């Protein structure tokens, strides 16, 4: 047993491979921009490979979790507490962004005339139909057909189907039935497929980063460096102070948690999409002691309702545009902006570019800030996407552990052991460790 738990050489560890790939991608994109842009298919292929399995993995995980539960009341309790947590923490994130941007004022002194801006680049984000109403968003959770939900990879629609299927399967016997066993075996196969695809994560991160630097250039980072610096600083403060306090109150350390998911963070840094590690995060949250049913409900739901990084970005970007264009905003107008963002931010999925679409829709709805001002930040939005995705990922991970503890679905001893023994966690693939733990339980 000691041999199987031996820590592998550094060059075989995924986070080292991804970090190296990201650095190489940055260098290639900077010194050979055209070649860097040509590397885009590598990043796209990796993300598509992960996305093709997200829907079936969510379905299997949620169905197994719900159908295998003894007390079905816990499902409703878990969902209710998760939504309550999402709303509270998202509101805090919006407020933190609003406070910091008013204190640092990164847009002050730019004196940009909105009429002089070239708005052709933002037309794709501000066109009609890009952002639906709240009613349309809620109705869209119900798919037109089950096949359509899986074909399009709509996370909330798949989650809706999985919850219904899980309840129905529980009614007909749940654990021990042939259908349950089939779904359980299918789940193992799907996670094995994810493990295979994750071997190519360094190549995907390299391609995505080389493209980003090659297309937009490092120079674009400096032109609006104050906004980027303020945003990255705010995200760090939110993660290590706000989420840090929440973590401490619930019995774990945020620094150890971030270290625990460092591989996933590096992959997200390279791809700018938190969806690229969704299946792996579900595995790792189970390894921390959260039960499958809780993980299956909280993680997928959080990808639409608990986007802390996107929330920070939305308030900071909106007020920054107002400052840069010398558009005065009263306290009432900022509170109104906050209230509108509480609704519109829920429509931002965990994919690249969604935050910009939501920002465009919000500015159009509020009317106080010129929508043309979006052209100011269009060039650096891709670089800010990394911080959004990273903060979203940490936020959803913390939310899962917190909700699991609130509902009594967390093994505190396993949580402590996993966070304190990262060498044991890194020694093997997550699915191998899960199998090892299940064998011990038997």
Swiss-Prot record:
<keyword id="KW-0813">Transport</keyword>
<feature type="transmembrane region" description="Helical">
    <location>
        <begin position="336"/>
        <end position="356"/>
    </location>
</feature>
<comment type="similarity">
    <text>Belongs to the dicarboxylate/amino acid:cation symporter (DAACS) (TC 2.A.23) family.</text>
</comment>
<feature type="transmembrane region" description="Helical">
    <location>
        <begin position="193"/>
        <end position="213"/>
    </location>
</feature>
<feature type="transmembrane region" description="Helical">
    <location>
        <begin position="357"/>
        <end position="377"/>
    </location>
</feature>
<comment type="function">
    <text>Responsible for the transport of dicarboxylates such as succinate, fumarate, and malate across the membrane.</text>
</comment>
<feature type="transmembrane region" description="Helical">
    <location>
        <begin position="13"/>
        <end position="33"/>
    </location>
</feature>
<feature type="transmembrane region" description="Helical">
    <location>
        <begin position="312"/>
        <end position="332"/>
    </location>
</feature>
<keyword id="KW-1133">Transmembrane helix</keyword>
<dbReference type="InterPro" id="IPR018107">
    <property type="entry name" value="Na-dicarboxylate_symporter_CS"/>
</dbReference>
<dbReference type="GO" id="GO:0015366">
    <property type="term" value="F:malate:proton symporter activity"/>
</dbReference>
<dbReference type="Pfam" id="PF00375">
    <property type="entry name" value="SDF"/>
</dbReference>
<feature type="transmembrane region" description="Helical">
    <location>
        <begin position="227"/>
        <end position="247"/>
    </location>
</feature>
<keyword id="KW-0812">Transmembrane</keyword>
<dbReference type="GO" id="GO:0005886">
    <property type="term" value="C:plasma membrane"/>
</dbReference>
<feature type="transmembrane region" description="Helical">
    <location>
        <begin position="49"/>
        <end position="69"/>
    </location>
</feature>
<feature type="transmembrane region" description="Helical">
    <location>
        <begin position="149"/>
        <end position="169"/>
    </location>
</feature>
<keyword id="KW-0769">Symport</keyword>
<dbReference type="InterPro" id="IPR023954">
    <property type="entry name" value="C4_dicarb_transport"/>
</dbReference>
<dbReference type="InterPro" id="IPR036458">
    <property type="entry name" value="Na:dicarbo_symporter_sf"/>
</dbReference>
<keyword id="KW-0472">Membrane</keyword>
<dbReference type="GO" id="GO:0015141">
    <property type="term" value="F:succinate transmembrane transporter activity"/>
</dbReference>
<protein>
    <recommendedName>
        <fullName>C4-dicarboxylate transport protein</fullName>
    </recommendedName>
</protein>
<dbReference type="GO" id="GO:0070778">
    <property type="term" value="P:L-aspartate transmembrane transport"/>
</dbReference>
<dbReference type="GO" id="GO:0015138">
    <property type="term" value="F:fumarate transmembrane transporter activity"/>
</dbReference>
<keyword id="KW-1003">Cell membrane</keyword>
<dbReference type="InterPro" id="IPR001991">
    <property type="entry name" value="Na-dicarboxylate_symporter"/>
</dbReference>
<feature type="transmembrane region" description="Helical">
    <location>
        <begin position="81"/>
        <end position="101"/>
    </location>
</feature>
């Amino acid at each position: 047993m000691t041999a199987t738990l031996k820590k592998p050489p550094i060059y075989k560890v995924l986070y080292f491979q991804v970090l190296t790939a990201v650095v190489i991608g940055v260098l290639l994109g900077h010194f050979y921009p055209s070649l860097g842009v040509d590397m885009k298919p590598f990043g796209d292929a990796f993300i598509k490979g992960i996305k093709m399995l997200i829907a079936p993995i969510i379905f299997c995980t949620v169905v197994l979790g719900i159908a295998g539960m003894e007390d079905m009341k816990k499902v409703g309790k878990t969902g209710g507490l998760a939504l309550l947590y999402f709303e509270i923490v998202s509101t805090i994130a919006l407020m933190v962004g609003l406070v910091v941007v008013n204190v640092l004022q990164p847009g002050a002194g730019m004196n940009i005339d909105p009429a002089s801006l070239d708005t052709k680049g933002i037309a794709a984000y501000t066109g009609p139909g890009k952002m639906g109403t709240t009613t349309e968003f809620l109705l869209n959770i119900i798919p037109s057909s089950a096949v359509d939900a899986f074909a399009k990879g709509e996370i909330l629609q798949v989650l809706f189907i999985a919850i219904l299927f899980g309840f129905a399967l529980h009614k007909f016997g749940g654990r021990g039935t042939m259908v349950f066993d089939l779904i359980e075996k299918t789940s193992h196969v799907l996670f094995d497929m994810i493990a295979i695809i994750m071997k190519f994560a360094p190549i995907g991160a390299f391609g995505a980063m080389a493209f980003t630097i090659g297309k937009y250039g490092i120079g674009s980072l400096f032109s609006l460096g104050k906004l980027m610096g303020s945003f990255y600083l705010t995200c760090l403060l939110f993660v290590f102070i706000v989420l840090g306090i929440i973590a401490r109150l619930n019995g774990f350390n945020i620094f150890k948690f971030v270290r625990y998911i460092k591989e996933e963070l590096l992959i997200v840094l390279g791809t700018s999409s938190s969806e690229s590690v969704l299946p792996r995060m579900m595995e790792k949250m189970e390894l921390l002691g959260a039960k499958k049913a809780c993980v299956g409900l909280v993680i997928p739901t959080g990808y639409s309702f608990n986007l802390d990084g996107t929330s920070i970005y939305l308030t900071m970007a909106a007020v920054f545009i107002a400052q840069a264009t010398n558009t005065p905003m009263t306290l009432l107008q900022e509170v109104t902006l906050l209230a509108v963002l509480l609704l519109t931010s829920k429509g931002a999925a965990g994919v690249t570019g969604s935050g910009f679409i939501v920002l465009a829709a919000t500015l159009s709805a509020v009317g106080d800030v010129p929508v043309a001002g979006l052209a100011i930040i269009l060039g650096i939005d891709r670089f800010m996407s990394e911080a959004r995705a990273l903060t979203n990922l940490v936020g959803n991970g913390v939310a899962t552990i917190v909700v699991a503890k609130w509902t009594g679905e967390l093994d505190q001893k396993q949580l402590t052991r996993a966070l304190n023994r990262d060498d044991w966690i890194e020694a093997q693939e997550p699915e191998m460790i899960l199998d090892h733990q299940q064998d011990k339980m038997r």
